[in-house]
Regions:
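Targeting-peptide/extracellular-domain and disordered-appendage signature
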Residues: 1-135
Length: 135
């Protein structure tokens, strides 16, 4: 147990967690493989997964997240104008997390969620970097 410096799976071949920490996103979160080994532990009600992204400048702070708690998903976006001391915030809850897709790795794939017909949040990793779509 200690610092990891190379990419690895968060769940090992026996379905157990590879303990340790990393200074950057190195873990592949293959929950499908883990769930097939330990169904009782990885039930839909026990898994908590999220993706969070933020940008901070001297004048503006922006943050967005998609959290899936098993029984509920939450979409949140914040924009804080530091100079004017104005906060804009939008939050939506999705019962049972229906339609929420979380990528297995923060540096690959797409994480997205839609609440109703108009609220949409997506994080997409491309060769150019992470793209965020908010509707």
């Amino acid at each position: 147990v200690g610092e990891h410096t190379k990419p690895l799976s968060m769940i090992n071949g026996n379905g157990l967690v590879n303990f340790g920490w990393a200074r950057q996103p190195l873990f592949d979160v293959n929950m499908t493989a883990a769930a097939s080994v330990h169904r009782h532990i990885f039930s839909a009600w026990r898994l908590k997964r999220w993706e969070y992204f933020y940008v901070a400048t001297p004048t503006v702070f922006f943050a967005a997240q998609i959290a899936h708690l098993g029984y509920l998903a939450n979409l949140t976006a914040y924009l804080y104008d530091i100079e004017r001391n104005v906060l804009l915030e939008r939050t939506s809850n999705i019962p049972f997390g229906t339609g929420v897709v979380l990528a297995d790795h923060p540096r690959q794939g797409t994480t997205s969620a839609r609440a109703g017909t108009s609220k949409y949040l997506q994080f997409e990793m491309t060769p150019e970097g992470k793209h965020i779509t908010i509707d």
